[in-house]
Design a protein with these regions (language model features):
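Glycine-rich beta->alpha junctions and the first turn(s) of the following alpha-helix
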Residues: 3, 15, 199-253
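Short glycine/proline-enriched turns and hinge-like loops at secondary-structure junctions
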Residues: 67-69, 135-137, 161-165, 179-182, ...
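A short, Trp-centered hydrophobic/proline-enriched beta-strand micro-motif
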Residues: 119-127
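Cytochrome P450 C-terminal beta-domain/meander region
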Residues: 135-153
């Protein structure tokens, strides 16, 4: 954890200035190239981390900016005016940091929040499936107890940052027939055996968004990598989807 306990949240003006400087320095020169499919991960996430943009809603004690949601939406609107795809990639990784700090401050956040906020790691959320879309009650990805952890099996598709991610929050069914009550969320690492990226056909202009699929074949997650237990994950993801509808609308304006 980065100790910023004595600091005050940055003003909205200073954050917007930092976002504008980042946009002019990194997005303007690269947007056209990325739009043709020539995306370089390090040119986006690490500079964004250095500008503080990977911690917009992360608490101060973790080194974040502790912005209210409305100011986060304003920052995303500014970035999206120049490169919507890149802005979506950034916010999706940022959202995982905020999620880990909230849900797992003693286990997962100390391991991953720092590198995610610096842009040294990239994260994504894997919900959508080929046969179920984003309908949590009908997802087919399963999580089965294995010793002290879980084995994940299934396929996700149309996932933002799937092509870039080092860490993925995977939503999976832990008990067949239990509907949303059995859904849990796990943090899976891309270097785990059985983790496979799957290409999806999309427009080259979206290359910085890293849209892709994931195939999980007996991917092992330690018990400590359970982000939300069964019964908790559904409530969290539905709230997250509602927030996303709001900030994506702001990005489109």
């Amino acid at each position: 954890m980065t100790s910023n306990a004595d600091q005050l949240p940055q003003s909205a003006d200073s954050v917007m200035q930092a976002a504008d400087q980042f946009a002019q320095r990194q997005l303007v020169p690269h947007a056209a190239q990325w739009g043709r499919g020539y995306f370089e991960r390090k040119a986006l996430f690490e500079p964004a981390g250095a500008a503080g943009l990977m911690g917009l809603q992360v608490p101060l004690e973790w080194g974040g900016m502790a912005l209210p949601f409305a100011d986060k939406a304003k920052v995303l609107h500014k970035l999206a005016q120049i490169d919507f795809s890149a802005a979506m990639a950034l916010v999706n990784s940022h959202n995982v940091v905020a999620q880990l700090v909230k849900a797992s401050p003693h286990t997962l956040a100390p391991l991953y929040a720092g590198n995610l906020m610096r842009g040294l790691m990239v994260a994504c959320t894997a919900l959508t499936e080929p046969g179920a879309g984003s309908d949590l009650g009908h997802i087919q990805t399963t999580a089965v107890r294995q010793g002290e952890g879980w084995l994940l099996n299934g396929e996700k598709t149309w996932i933002i940052n799937a092509a870039h991610a080092d860490a993925v929050v995977v939503y999976a069914q832990t008990q067949t027939g239990s509907g949303v009550k059995g859904i849990a969320a796990f943090l899976a690492l891309a270097d785990t055996p059985g983790f496979e990226r799957v290409a999806v056909t999309t427009h080259t202009a979206l290359s910085s968004m890293g849209i892709g699929g994931l195939r999980l074949k007996n991917v092992y997650c330690d018990a400590s990598h359970l982000v939300y237990a069964p019964g908790e994950a559904f409530v969290d993801i539905m709230a997250a989807i509602n927030r996303a509808r709001t900030y994506v609308a702001a990005m489109c304006c």
